[in-house]
Curated annotation (Swiss-Prot):
UniProt binding sites for heme: 461
Name of the protein: Cytochrome P450 monooxygenase yanH
InterPro entries associated with the record: Cyt_P450, Cyt_P450_CS, Cyt_P450_E_grp-I, Cyt_P450_sf, Cytochrome_P450_monoxygenase
EC identifiers of the protein: 1.-.-.-
Organism from which the protein derives: Aspergillus niger (strain ATCC 1015 / CBS 113.46 / FGSC A1144 / LSHB Ac4 / NCTC 3858a / NRRL 328 / USDA 3528.7)
Names of the cofactor(s): heme
């Protein structure tokens, strides 16, 4: 306190002229910087908002808000601007956003020289995870224990475990129907995804489905934390507050509080797993934690420290909970809302599940053409990881087809949503239409090239096989077992804001009556 008092007194005794000079210097510096960035920067050739050229202000303006439709709008604003101004826009002082589908496979192809920007994950969290690793050699080493685990062969071995969670979910639907209560489908399907991915991660599920309203703490925390990343990206100093004790963080920032909750949740689960493993208590199927704790010297993999393990688990559960839950939510709503789609899908499901209590193997479900078309359309339409995923332009820069040059080190990105809703690739993109995936092998293959919900290349989502199995099983069994009736939910409720993952404007509620035939 004495030091603070001395500094305060010293500053107060400075002449007014010095303060005025400092203020003038500050103003002149930022004025010169603004003129340079807007008119003379190498990126000044790209159109866009002048505010975007100066910093995060433009993006923050469109993304940070409270009311539905007044937050998370950058994604949609970019779409409008691209249609007016062309395929490349100024997105920041050192960032260009691209809207050209052909460039997507250059940017995200296997062996791409466009590396991840490490500064992004330092701000957004989990900086020591495999997901955040920007160096391709280290990234390959970090993936070594996980790639075999997420292979289709290994994921197929999880079918019985996943089926137990589907059965538990259906049991909860029965309980609520017997009480005359509708199911909040978004929360239920996110809880189902949470139980599946947490058991795969730790060998023991979080039992989120058992929560009376499907709003267990882990599901709520992830639901509330991800949208706060817009605030953290715009104001990185908020991330620094995470070092404060939780009781202080609660009083300062809800975003920081949620971040604390997530870190403590992951740390507890890791400690519990390590303690159980030391006592010889391990599950009878391979888990993520088990593989992460085994070094692979020949592939350069070393066991991460506690922070590294925590970051891996947080990214795994975040990627496997919200995204799959959202894809299932959007898909199921559109099945119920469109009776033609519903009836055709139900008829096909009856060919492998003659009664509502029948079971079908996952490999049987995969072979159903209309179910497969519904799943693909659900992934396109929901675009659960919709936002742009920036990369850094490699040494030498890149010249776009129109001749404009982007210097090396520039951040450049594209959004999955803009691919999935591109009218040149998908006719009537705002219509949920499974038929677009049943128009012959040549057309379907062309469209499949641009179905990229899991991204592409060496940095694509490891969990693709798990996500597909979860979706096939959840959609097939819920539709076959229940005659679902919407309760007040309309397409307006299913509109969404891009809060890192889609955040719906309303609630998807349905009565879950068991079928008798």
């Amino acid at each position: 306190m004495a030091l603070f008092s001395v500094l305060s007194n010293a500053l107060s005794e400075l002449p007014v002229s010095i303060w005025l000079a400092a203020a003038a210097t500050f103003a002149v510096y930022h004025a010169i910087r603004a003129v340079y960035l807007i008119f003379f920067s190498p990126l000044a050739i790209f159109p866009g908002s002048p505010w975007a050229a100066l910093g995060e202000y433009w993006e923050a303006y469109w993304n940070i808000g409270v009311r539905p439709g007044h937050k998370g709008q950058t994604l949609f604003k970019l779409e409008q601007m691209h249609k007016r101004l062309g395929p490349a826009l100024r997105m920041g002082p050192n960032e260009v956003h691209i809207y050209d589908p052909a460039f997507y496979h250059e940017l995200y192809r296997p062996g791409s020289r466009y590396y991840k920007d490490p500064s992004m994950h330092k701000v957004l969290g989990a900086p020591t995870s495999t997901l955040a690793e920007s160096d391709p050699v280290r990234h390959k080493q970090r993936k070594a224990p996980l790639e075999p685990l997420f292979s289709k062969k290994n994921i197929l071995s999880l079918e019985n475990m996943l089926m137990e969670h589907v059965d538990h979910c259906c049991q909860r639907f029965d309980e609520l129907y017997s009480q005359g209560k509708p199911v909040s489908m978004e929360w239920a399907l996110k809880s189902l995804a949470m139980d599946m991915v947490s058991q795969f991660a730790f060998g023991q599920s979080l039992n989120a489905i058992a929560d009376p309203e499907f709003k267990s703490l882990p599901v709520r925390v992830f639901q509330q934390y991800l949208p706060s990343l817009h605030v953290i990206k715009a104001f990185p100093f908020v991330r620094l507050l995470s070092s404060l004790p939780l009781w202080i963080a609660r009083r300062i920032s809800h975003s920081v509080e949620m971040g604390h909750e997530l870190e403590q949740f992951a740390a507890r689960r890791i400690d519990e797993y390590i303690e159980a493993a030391a006592q010889g208590k391990t599950p009878n199927f391979p888990t993520v934690m088990e593989r992460l704790l085994i070094p692979i010297p020949e592939k350069g993999y070393e066991v991460p420290d506690k922070q590294g393990l925590r970051d891996e688990i947080l990214t795994l559960i975040s990627a496997g909970d919200d995204t799959t839950g959202i894809a299932n939510t959007v898909t199921l709503f559109n099945i119920i809302h469109n009776r033609t789609i519903h009836d055709r899908l139900l008829a096909e499901l009856k060919t492998v599940m003659p009664t509502p209590t029948s079971h079908a193997q996952y490999i049987q479900l995969e072979q159903l053409p209309y179910l497969t078309a519904v799943i693909k359309e659900g992934l396109r339409y929901s675009s659960p990881a919709a936002s742009r995923t920036p990369r850094l332009v490699p040494p030498g820069g890149v010249r776009l087809p129109d001749g404009r040059f982007i210097p090396a080190g520039t951040r450049v990105g594209m959004a999955i949503y803009h691919i999935h809703y591109n009218e040149g690739l998908f006719e009537n993109p705002h219509e949920f239409d499974p038929e677009r995936w049943l128009q012959g092998p040549e057309i379907t293959a062309k469209r499949a090239k641009f179905l990229v919900p899991f991204s592409r290349g060496s940095r694509s989502c490891l969990g693709i096989n798990l996500a597909y199995m979860e979706m096939y099983m959840a959609i097939a069994y819920i539709v076959r077992r229940f005659d679902l009736e919407l309760v007040g939910t309309t397409p307006e409720d299913m509109k969404w804001d891009d809060m890192v993952v889609p955040q719906f404007h309303g609630e998807f509620r349905a009565l879950t009556k068991r079928r008798v035939d």
